[in-house]
A protein has these predicted regions:
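Extended ligand-binding groove/face enriched in aromatic
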Residues: 145, 150-243, 251
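Oxyanion-binding "anion nests"
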Residues: 292-328
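Fungal secretory targeting signals
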Residues: 1-20
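Short coil/turn linking the two alpha-helices of tandem helical-hairpin repeats
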Residues: 138, 187-188, 241-245, 304-308, ...
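Fungal extracellular Ser/Thr-rich, low-complexity intrinsically disordered regions
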Residues: 15-96, 148, 152, 377, ...
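CBM-like carbohydrate-recognition segments
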Residues: 84-133, 140-174, 225, 318, ...
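Residue-level signature of alpha-solenoid helical repeat scaffolds
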Residues: 132, 181, 201, 235, ...
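Active-site cradle of extracellular carbohydrate-active enzymes
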Residues: 230-233, 237-241, 249-303
Length: 447
């Protein structure tokens, strides 16, 4: 995964930043906000179906936009003023705000329109996460128009997609795997063969990126075998198998997961390390991130579904236990998951697949819902309802003040979170972060 700008990832003190994280700058493995929990509350989410109105059609028709803004403004106001958190359909409200703030002139903008900055084209990672977020709202028009914009990233030489149309050399396996998921979902939504063909082409390309000792190379023509590229490739394969019934896809996915457990699992806490060198598997980067575990859980429960392999289910349960260990690498000192939203949303996705495919994961439901409610309550901007910050440490004073009603700690003000570095202006939001938030809120509504 990659992008532009600087985000700060809170890592456990024993870990270094994973090698494949392009959006994170960590100069020292320190925790920025140290807090002590003084209270918590768990709320259950309500199961909902996706609203049927098309946000894409609304934002490409000014006449419809005014009506939709009016109808949703009441919902936004109600959800932000209520004393009891009710995630419910909030994923739809957040998607509305994403269209409102990042869509204009027929294209997606990586910059928040509230800040009036110059246009910046989103990288492929962002577009893939955004595509899946739009899928969650059931908005066929939105998926189609977004995939149409993504076609400018297409690389005819590989039949995969570039990190950016402005860079004709960077092709990342993990970004392409996520995009394959979007094409697969688009095919299911529309029946259009072109979407299935693109998904097949992407998976075929990714299969050419297998290292000599297994695993999936993270970036074309490089040596790094990333955990995330390996497990996202496996997940793309099992999702594609669900349509094509090509058994070779299950073999490929199984090989990927076997590589992970053999070469990149920490024997102590059972989580996965970040990656290794394709020519020397002993060179292991020992960073750990939530999205690797989330994609692994999804892949394993699908493999169990399709093959009836008990070992796959047992391994998924092992990872679920490791991911929810409050003393583990994914937790801060307050019992909250410590990863940025753009990583942790795939852990929520993994549990969503697990809850749906096996009753054995029900023991983890309360913990996962608690984590989602933490995001809904404390990472949502109180001055900009339905939009989110990636971490409490990367938020605003008013956001932290609400947080500090239940948690004690310190907060360092950072003017760079505001438009034009001016605290009197809006806090700028990130497209990738809020596309991730849409997915988290959707899973919360359907657990």
């Amino acid at each position: 995964m990659h992008g532009f700008g600087i985000l700060v990832l809170i890592l456990p003190l024993c870990l270094s930043a994973p090698a494949n994280v392009r959006t994170v700058v960590v100069t020292a493995p320190v925790e920025i906000v140290t807090v002590t929990q003084v209270g918590t509350q768990i709320y259950s989410a309500t199961s909902l179906e996706a609203p049927t109105s098309s946000l894409a059609e609304s934002f490409t028709s000014s006449a419809k936009t005014t009506s939709l803004e009016s109808s949703l403004s009441t919902s936004l106001s109600t959800s932000s003023s209520s004393s009891v958190p009710t995630p419910g359909s909030s994923y739809y409200n957040t998607m509305f705000k994403v269209w409102q703030r990042f869509w204009g002139d027929g294209k997606w903008n990586d910059n928040d329109s509230n800040c009036n900055d110059a246009y910046t084209l989103p990288v492929l990672w962002t577009m893939a996460v955004l595509g899946e977020a739009i899928v969650k709202t059931g908005d066929v028009s939105g998926v189609e128009v977004t995939l149409d914009r993504i076609m400018q990233y297409y690389d005819s030489a590989t039949k995969a997609f570039l990190a950016s149309p402005n860079d004709g050399v960077e092709v990342y396996s993990d970004d392409n795997a996520q995009l394959a998921w979007v094409f697969i979902d688009a095919f299911k939504m529309t029946g259009q063969q072109k979407y299935l063909d693109h998904a097949k082409d992407i998976v075929l390309y990714i299969q050419t990126q297998q290292g000599p000792n297994g695993g999936i190379i993270w970036k074309k023509d490089k040596n790094y075998i990333a955990s995330i590229s390996t497990v996202e490739a496996a997940l793309a394969a099992v999702r594609l198998y669900d349509i094509t019934r090509d058994n070779s896809l299950l073999e490929f996915a199984t090989d990927c997961m076997d590589f992970m457990f053999k070469n990149l699992q920490d024997p102590q806490d059972k989580l996965f390390f970040d990656g290794t060198d394709k020519n020397d598997l002993g060179q292991v980067d020992k960073g750990k991130l939530t999205y690797t575990i989330g994609c692994s859980i999804s892949t394993l429960v699908y493999l169990h579904k399709f093959r009836g392999d008990q070992d796959m289910l047992d391994k998924a349960l092992e990872l679920a236990l490791a991911a929810t260990n409050p003393g583990g690498a994914f937790y801060d000192g307050n019992g909250n998951w410590n990863n940025n939203l753009e990583y942790v949303h795939l852990l929520f996705a993994g549990f969503a697949d697990a809850f749906r495919l096996s009753d054995l994961f029900g023991q983890y439901r309360d913990e996962v819902v608690k984590q989602g409610n933490y995001i809904y309550q404390y990472l949502q901007d109180p001055k900009d309802p339905s939009l989110y910050f990636t971490l409490i440490a990367a938020s605003t004073r008013s956001t932290f003040d609400r947080y500090s009603k239940l948690f004690r700690g310190s907060f360092d003000d950072d003017d760079s979170v505001y438009c034009n570095n001016d605290p009197s202006q809006h806090a700028k939001k990130k497209l990738l972060v809020n596309a991730s938030a849409v997915q988290i809120l959707y899973f919360m509504a359907n657990y």
